[in-house]
Amino acid sequence: MRTPPRTARQIAFTVLRQWRETGRFAAGLLETAFSRTDGISTADRGLACELTYGVIRRQGTLDAVLRPQIKRPPEQVEADLWMLLQLGAYQLLFLSSHSQHAAIHETVELTRWLNKARWRGFANGVLRSVQRDLGEGTAETAAADAIPTGPGRFLQLAR
């Protein structure tokens, strides 16, 4: 990384990486990250928390959505790249208040911040594939390929 994290997504990625590497509680890691970031708005703090806790909470769901989009086993994808894909997929699946285009764009932009230009096309392709597989609305009952998005709510995959 060239610069310290300044955006909600950069903070979330940094905290998720530290959480994965150290096993420390995400809450403490977030507070440390916020204390080191000047001028972050309340809204961006909230987004960083939502992204961090959401990816941790929904790892199994995110992995299940990502696996069919990638030809190689997850173990052969670099850990930071997989986490970046989880972050993008979380935004597509669970943050209805954010546009899908922005979620993909901002996630792909993280590759630049991470100095990983070679990940750019791969991340864009995988996240666009996830986007194509999402259905238009929510389902009332859980089909075999539905994604739980809340109590009694499911997002139907378009496959």
Label each region the model flagged.
Residues 1-159:
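Class I Rossmann-like S-adenosyl-L-methionine
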